[in-house]
Amino acid sequence: MDREYLLKLCEDIRADRISCEDAADILKELPFKDMEFARIDNHRSLRTGYPEVVFCQGKTDSQIADIMELLWQKNSTVMGTRATEANYSAVRERLPEAEYFEQARIIAVSRKEADKKGSIAVITAGTSDIPVAEEAAVTAEILGNNVSRIYDVGVAGIHRLFDSLDEIRKANAVIVCAGMEGALASVTGGLVDIPVIAVPTSIGYGASFNGLAALLSMLNSCANGISVVNIDNGFGAAYTASMINRGKYE
């Protein structure tokens, strides 16, 4: 239940479009709805500004569809991460308006286009990092941010990064997705005066240990202003960057 939904409910009660009894039935599901296999947090948007997001991995198609359908009843935007085509097909049967972002593996449905303010830059070291970057970029857009995508600017050809610095510096936060040794986050952090959210990716050869090498490199960065999220966690990076960007306009 987001603030817009709650205000509309109050207005409907005041205008006698809904009875007090019906309103009580709606409000009794606050702060959460028990679905037995999940307890849906109806207060998430009121507390944090964003509704609950469905992590689809490990859930059945039916569970995902049930959860997203329930969230849709009380929120203007609903999204699910780490979703498959099969997950999307199940959701679309309930919510025909739903979209699927294949590379980002995100399902999203919205009643209206977000009023986007400010911008977030999303950059990658290589093309192989793009799926993680797209999870970040699409999430940031759904959450109401303009996004600049700057891909394949890793340290093996550092001049490519320098060529895009003006665009990166216009953003209020930058998300850096890099695998292998993860050096791009440190380099970027030493060149900009905005927060850097580093995302280690699982891309690389054997000794990269599926992103562990990049994670440790980013955690040990000597550049200031860098925060690090979990391996391949584009969603977490976008959520943090969105809070930073949103704070500029509230």
Question: PLM features: residue spans?
Answer:
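Long amphipathic alpha-helical segments
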Residues: 1-84, 88, 94, 98
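Short glycine-rich or small-residue beta-strand-to-loop segments that form or flank ligand, phosphate
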Residues: 53-54, 78, 119-125, 174-176, ...
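Short glycine/serine/threonine-rich phosphate/pyrophosphate-binding segments
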Residues: 62-64, 129-134, 158-159, 178-187, ...
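Glycine-rich oxoanion-binding loops at beta->alpha junctions
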Residues: 104-108, 146-167, 212-213, 229
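Glycine-rich phosphate/diphosphate-binding loop of Rossmann-like nucleotide-binding domains
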Residues: 117-159
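C-terminal binding/interaction regions
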Residues: 124, 128, 166-169, 173, ...
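Glycine-rich phosphate-binding loop
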Residues: 163-201
